[in-house]
Amino acid sequence: MSLNPVIFSIGPVSIYWYSLAYVLGIVFAYWYLHKLDDQKIFTKNFYDSLLTATIVGIILGGRLGYVLIYDPVLYISNPIEILKTWEGGMSFHGGAIGVLLAVIISCKRHNIPTFYALDLVSCGVPIGLFLGRIGNFINGELFGRVTTMPWGMVFPESGDNLLHHPSQLYEALFEGLLLFAVANSLFFLTRIRLYHGALTGIAVMWYGIARFFVEFFREPDYQIGYLWLDLTMGQLLSIPMVLLGMLVYLGALNLKFNTKSVT
């Protein structure tokens, strides 16, 4: 399977599907926040601040996370490669930290309840995750392990001409579409939105569990391979995510993180 990662080129400038996926994900999340904030807690200045901070957080956090965690030797020896984000190489965990900091900073600056904002962000972000994984699929990167399943695909980047799990699509489904469905069902159909932070905790737990599971079908990064207990780096990073999500969820229910309530 080989798809052209470039949408079109104008002279030396090329527009990539992977880059477009990030842009569409951010645009959707920005639009969706307006729809979810039916009580109009967010101000225009907050939206503008959050949008700018989120873009910076995603790019810097995602790229630096990948550079520092997955392939530091390569980028230290070829630092110019750090700037080539359109070729892939973004860490979700690094990007998540960047978005978290963006939300916290923006909320503090504009006196917005942080966990209220995080809950709403958790409802929109999964579509960005879905689009990002589709971008990975088009790039032919982050493919799965060798399989005999009829839906296996040959990825030229693997260099072995064997069938591999399309693990990018598994992640798009479990970490993107299903998380979007679960988060929004809870938001609209239950009273969980009254416990600020509870939905954030559930979303973080869901992603961590989904990522841990899908990693069993995903080829580990060649420069890292298998680590402790034959787990991948993605799995090891997902374990603290699950624990953190559980802590936030229980805290929202029992410690009343929503001290500044919005009713």
Swiss-Prot record:
Residues that hold a 1,2-diacyl-sn-glycero-3-phospho-(1'-sn-glycerol) according to the record: R133
EC number: 2.5.1.145
InterPro entries (alphabetical): Lgt
Main location per the UniProt record: membrane
Biological process terms in GO annotation: lipoprotein biosynthetic process
Pfam families xref list: LGT
Record-annotated membrane-spanning stretches: 6-26, 50-70, 85-105, 112-132, 169-189, 197-217, 233-253
UniProt-annotated location(s): Cell membrane
Pathway(s) it belongs to: Protein modification; lipoprotein biosynthesis (diacylglyceryl transfer)
GO molecular function: phosphatidylglycerol-prolipoprotein diacylglyceryl transferase activity
Membrane topology, as annotated: Multi-pass membrane protein
Entry keyword Membrane: yes
Keyword tags: Cell membrane, Membrane, Transferase, Transmembrane, Transmembrane helix
GO CC annotation terms, alphabetical: plasma membrane
Function, in words: Catalyzes the transfer of the diacylglyceryl group from phosphatidylglycerol to the sulfhydryl group of the N-terminal cysteine of a prolipoprotein, the first step in the formation of mature lipoproteins.
Family according to the record: Belongs to the Lgt family.
Database matches in PANTHER family: PHOSPHATIDYLGLYCEROL--PROLIPOPROTEIN DIACYLGLYCERYL TRANSFERASE (PTHR30589:SF0), PROLIPOPROTEIN DIACYLGLYCERYL TRANSFERASE (PTHR30589)
The protein's name in its UniProt record: Phosphatidylglycerol--prolipoprotein diacylglyceryl transferase
Organism encoding this protein: Wolbachia pipientis wMel
